[in-house]
């Protein structure tokens, strides 16, 4: 009897830790999210309205920022942009600038293949392949849910890999639902 209680307690604890690690991994990936063209960000410098702005990153990935000139933001995280602007404003312009950068709107993801309405859709954090397909009107009758691929750009290189319907997508992903052959 006590042996069974120990087993159940151990199993419950193992599941709890697995869920905690999984949740932490999801948060970690969004904190390491690299900005790309199409993302809308808000740059705020406390008490400095002329240095605060909301902007969509253009295709070239650079913005003109007051006093600092052209800044290339594509491939950087929000924290790295904060640091870049903080360091640039520190000393010559402000004594101790309070800079924050937030992602207001992520770039869209694209879904094609065997979905009813292929195209680009706004990304939302926590979006799985299944939810993305639902946004695209659902799967067609010929969809092979076991043959789904994602093309994702990381550090300037494109990678293609197979995923399941429960895997999470990221902004800018191209999801392809392949056709099932009867």
List PLM regions with ranges.
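Bacterial N-terminal signal peptides
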Residues: 9-20
């Amino acid at each position: 009897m006590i042996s069974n209680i120990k087993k159940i307690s151990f199993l419950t604890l193992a599941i709890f830790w697995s869920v905690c690690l999984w949740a932490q991994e999801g948060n970690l990936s969004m904190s390491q999210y690299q900005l790309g063209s199409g993302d809308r960000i808000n740059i705020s410098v406390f008490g400095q309205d002329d240095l605060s702005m909301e902007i969509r990153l253009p295709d070239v990935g650079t913005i003109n920022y007051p006093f600092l000139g052209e800044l290339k933001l594509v491939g950087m995280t929000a924290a790295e942009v904060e640091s870049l602007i903080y360091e640039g404003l520190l000393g010559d312009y402000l004594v101790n600038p309070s800079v924050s950068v937030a992602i207001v709107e992520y770039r869209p993801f694209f879904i094609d293949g065997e979905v009813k309405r292929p195209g680009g859709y706004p990304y939302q954090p926590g979006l799985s392949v299944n939810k993305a397909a639902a946004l695209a009107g659902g799967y067609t009758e010929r969809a092979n849910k076991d043959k789904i691929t994602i093309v994702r750009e990381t550090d300037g290189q494109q990678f293609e890999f197979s995923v399941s319907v429960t895997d999470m997508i990221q902004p800018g992903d191209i999801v392809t639902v392949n056709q099932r052959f009867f």
